[in-house]
Amino acid sequence: MDKKYKLWNYKYDFSEINLKNWKEVLKDTFKLNTRKIALLSMLFAIEILMTIISKVIMGLAIPMIVGVYTIEISFFVILIIYLCSNYIYASILSITAIWFRLLLGSEPVGLLSMMISDTAFLTIFAVLFFILKKFIFLKFKFKNQIKILIALICFAGLISMIGSGFISMLCNDKFIFEMYYLSDDGSGYWKMLLWVGFGVTLAKYSINILLFASTLKVLLILIKQSRV
């Protein structure tokens, strides 16, 4: 079969899947080789490093907001892992990195909340980005593909952060705050906490999407050259 790769010059992107090539697409997407394992290991190490930086340096620069929320800058590495591999591998490494924070003194309830938020964002982002690539990026020819990809990433990121924000609000309202022994006394503090959390979620993912988008051009070159 004459292969015509549309995004990468050496493999299928998952968004290129159809009834004829699905076996090859799944193989290209999920098969682990020495290069891919080495790359994922390196990126996971960078994620852990960024986690430590977020925990120590950012924790000192930006203390807990209203005693509950923090802003982390390590999630963009998970998006890089997603771009280099797939949603499943990115999710596994994301959850592993989140619970690694226990060794840095983070408390479990906050990590549970972070896991819900990050997993929700990554899931929505992966679905939206797949749809946008399949029905826009791969359907039409663009002079500047990098700019189009960045625009699609920003759009998918915007929808994902809003979705993740509302999911986090719902979880906070239903059980997360109760695990902090907080209660709604009718004073308005409960609702204020919920909306502050929504704002913090938007701020966190906005920063990480910008970091991810700013590195996209270099990432695409490195991925194509490394052929992972």
UniProtKB/Swiss-Prot annotation:
Record-level GO cellular component terms: plasma membrane
Membrane topology: Multi-pass membrane protein
UniProt cross-references to InterPro entries, sorted A to Z: Riboflavin_Transporter_RibV
Entry's induction text: Expression is probably regulated by riboflavin, via an FMN riboswitch.
Cystine pairings recorded for this chain: none
Membrane-spanning intervals of the chain: 37-57, 61-81, 87-107, 111-131, 148-168, 192-212
Keywords: Cell membrane, Membrane, Transmembrane, Transmembrane helix, Transport
Predominant location category: membrane
Compartments reported by the entry: Cell membrane
Superkingdom field: Bacteria
Job of this protein: Probably transports riboflavin.
NCBIfam families: MMSYN1_0877 (NF043064)
Protein name per UniProt: Putative riboflavin transporter RibV
Gene behind this protein: ribV
